[in-house]
Amino acid sequence: AKIAIGYRMDEIKNEITGKTKACFEPALDYVVVKFPKWPFDKFVYATRKLGTQMKATGEVMAIGRNFEQALMKAVRGAEISHDCLADVHMRALDDEALTAKILAQDDERIFAVYEALFRGFSIEKIHQLTLIDEWFLAKLLHLCDLEKRLETEPLTHDFLRELKRNGFPDKTIARLSGNSAFPHLPYSYKMVDTCGAEFAAETPYFYSTTDEEDEASAFIAEHSSKKPVVIVFGSGPIRIGQGIEFDYASVHCVWALKDAGYEVVIVNNNPETVSTDFNTADRLYFEPLTPEDVGDIIRVENPVGAVVAFGGQTAIRLTKWLSENNIPILGTPADSIDAAEDRGRFEALLKQLHIKQPVGDTVHTAEEAIETANRLGYPVLLRPSYVLGGQNMIIAFSDADVKEYMDIILSHMEGNLVLIDKYMMGTELEVDAICDGEDVLLPGIMEHIDRAGIHSGDSIAVYPAWNLSPAKTAKLVDYSTRLALALNTKGLINIQYVICQDQVYVIEVNPRSSRTVPYLSKVTGIPMVDIATRVMLGEKLKDMPYGTGLAPISSYTAIKVPVFSFEKLSGLDTQLGPEMKSTGEVLGIAPTMREALYKGLVGAGYQLTDKGGIFITVRDTDKDEIPDIAQRFADLGFHLYATAGTAAVLRDHGMSVTLVHKISESEHNTIALLESGKVNYIISTSKKGRTPARDSVKVRRKSVELGIPCLTSLDTAVALADILKSGFTPDTAELVDICTLQK
């Protein structure tokens, strides 16, 4: 930016050293590895092959004294259920299948290459197969040799230090050697300085290694401010379900802690975030968020407390270890977090509070799941415990669905239970609240346009809720207050509800920051993270100027609309459900709900037109509702196209509709219709559609290729028809200054 306005490089100071200029050639005594984070653990049917189109949702960065150390850090920091490059699935393949995997050019290729080297494939052969530079292959072979030695050699002090120097964590060493009776060799910390230690760096930005010199300890001793230290754990790589919203919360927490007079340390490994800017916190450690990797940071920093509430599930997973090692956790205690996640404890709490929840149970096996599903009655909702973004969460309609989904869930989970609930179709609402142990502040209640069954991150959310009666509002405030207090919450809590047959049920409670905190903070003007941080430090809500209970409702409407990246993941079904698929969101603000929704949809990339054709094909359970929706589009002048079953229903209701054949029935089929340019919108729902072979999935994938808006939620279709009827255009939509509105 400075160069753009006329500065020369010899006039710009290097902020890291504080002494050299930007023209000074960097000299690095460390190696950096960037490792992508792919979404294939969530999207098991998406095409994994990598090419020129980006498929990663995020990345981690790792720094080490050598390539091996940095690579091993990156692998375990990517949160892909690997603590090294050895992969049990690759080890089970024969040589022919392994060679095919190497040639596949997908996200698992590095593990296949490592396994081939471990088996004795030559570097030359793998280079011929992959064109990966032999330097990298030699480094992987070095790690293979160390793994083989682990299986046969005793763990002497020198060998242990060699392993640690090449990135092997204690957990991996113990597993591969079968020996856990060895001492932990503490990490030391080196400073990132860009000048090979020629000058003393001024930016406290550290990475771990096994050198004897500990530059972090020396820096702390030299620059001690005598302020108490707090460590904030970040959220790791951006992935679907855990995005930049959590970094927003982490950074605002850092600022609030600084304002309160604390020295703040950030631990994170995501180079895309503000939290890992070297000047955000007082000190930054670029490290994986695992117990071993953070343990020595805690030893060096000696904090008065640690913050896990703003780092998503990545930070929450550290809670148990922190508690067991007597590290003070600022905010909601570890036991309360467990009480919200443990099915038995949470059910007992709700019974004690006389609050309803959907009936359900916990299971360990596919057999138990099928038995439970039949007892509850289909459809049922399955999800692993302790997940974020609805990963591997699905609605099952049959025993076959349960069997298929349990196989997927059990292959990805790490020893947690699977929860099964009776699926309840109703209005879903969401509350973010702040509790200080005595009082509760609710900045707002959000209502989803899409009914329960679609993940909250993929639903269109509206603030303020527009369908709530005063009685229901009072009940939500009462339930939220009692839940927050009963869980001994100190800070933020997120609660999701469903209203079904006029009854309020609790779906989920998360005593931590959520992905809606930035949205609600900005549209209400209430600095939720700042307040929550102050509460975690012991301040009381009644001593702050924001009040308690439900905050005053705004006079404007703010709508959060999800953004999807379906065009980047071929083979992925676009039908929405309980597993989150969106990669971002936009905000529409206006005096009315319709105008706010119009702005949100346009901002999310929808190509809106008020005339043309609409193709409709829906599952049997939606055929009672589809006539009213189709009539709305017909009244706007849209020509209706539909497959046989849907067309019959629409004709029975007196509508004119063109019959379209399924893909397998004729060459004049749905795909041909979409390619003809006659269709401007698609409404497509199907009972089961995860596998790409089904007609419904092919239709939805074709819509992505052609850029035709495809609605898989009937509620979104109704909302779309309403805003098309309103006739908003970019010229007529009102420009809104939210700061003025808040006044």
Where do the protein language model's features map onto the residues?
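ATP-dependent carboxylate activation and anion-phosphoryl transfer catalytic cores
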Residues: 1-149, 153-159, 163-167, 222-228, ...
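ATP-binding N-terminal substructure of ATP-dependent carboxylate-amine bond-forming enzymes
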Residues: 74, 191-355, 364-371, 589-740
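Cofactor-pocket helix-loop regions in the catalytic cores of large enzyme subunits
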Residues: 117-131, 149-198, 202, 614-624, ...
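Conserved A3 ("GATE") glycine/threonine-rich loop of ANL adenylate-forming enzymes
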Residues: 341-344, 387-391
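Acidic/histidine-enriched active-site and ligand-binding environments that engage anionic O-linkages
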Residues: 371-380
